[in-house]
Amino acid sequence: MKRLLTGLKPTGNLTLGNYIGAIKPLVDLANTNEYEILLFVADLHALTVYQEPDLLRDRIKKFIAMYLACGVDPSKVTIYIQSDNTYIPAISWILECNTYYGEASRMIQFKEKSKCCDNFSIGLLTYPVLMAADILYCDADFVPVGVDQKQHVELARDIAIRFNKKYGETFNIPAPLITKLGTKIKDLKHPDKKMSKSEDNPSGVISLFDEPSSIIKKIKGATTDSDNLVYFDEENKPGISNLLNIASVMTGRSIDDLVSEFKNSGYGTFKTYVGEVTANKISEIQEKYNKLLNSSEIDEILNSGLNKSINLAKTKYEDMKKKVGLN
């Protein structure tokens, strides 16, 4: 069975966009039983910018509970916290010593984020190498990524090939799995932009922690066009198309089926429907989340996942140490 690695960074706020674009597709992928899946909380990656310590700690636990509440099955997905596996940073250092500055500085995200300030951390430059360590220590075959992250998987491949050539076969060569993850959900107020968990305008973003009344209010206030006909046309009707995508995922109904029912009903009726089905679905998730949050089940799941992760990483690290001359 091929091994697949994916991560979640505990920053910002989990949104409906995260659920539809990343969490639900992960659940669906796990249910195919085609892959051995590892899911890690990328808390070390979060430190490339300052995080308030208590808030970060709290968010890590909440994110794990929410992923589980959304249907991630720990019997099918190995879940662990990145920083709990201390072999990973050690592996990362050896990989850094086999990575060129030019490679790291060419990463598009580094170029973009380093423009915003003069005093960015070295971690912003080197975190793609830490990402390579995340991928390579467990010999992942596939890493599901969007187009913007593909470059980082390609760097991991280059590092692995170089290390193998220099020191002998050590790493499996991973491949990016370019995801069309579910549907990209747009901001309710600005349907030309994706719904972001760091969005400054909360009225356009549905959080998985929002109250049902707030969810309904936000959807009723979603930006739409003026012709009052419900049909799918992302170019000319981005707002309504976004709501159709949301309703389709929330209910399991096809977009054609929804259009058939609501095409001539008017936007008010359609928005009310979308608001109610979305609020109901998120309420179900929140009920599971509240039961999980302070339960011992999370600790048991994380301990089990960490043990597997450590066993894989220790074996890889000892092999690397021997090959580079450290023992």
Region spans (language model):
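Internal, conserved structured core segments that host functional sites
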Residues: 107-163, 167, 187
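A secondary-structure boundary/capping signal
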Residues: 40-43, 139, 181
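A generic secondary-structure signal for well-formed alpha-helical elements
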Residues: 64, 71, 99-102, 140, ...
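Conserved nucleotide- and phosphate/pyrophosphate-binding catalytic cores
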Residues: 151, 157-327
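N-terminal Rossmann-like or analogous alpha/beta NTP/dinucleotide-binding catalytic cores
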Residues: 2-5, 10-133, 277, 286
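Short helix-capping/linker segments at secondary-structure and domain boundaries
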Residues: 101-105, 137-144, 248-258
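Short, histidine-centered active-site or binding-site loop motifs used for metal coordination
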Residues: 8-10, 43-45, 141-142, 199, ...
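Short, polar/flexible loop-turn hinges at active-site or ligand-entry regions and domain interfaces
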Residues: 52-53, 143-146, 230
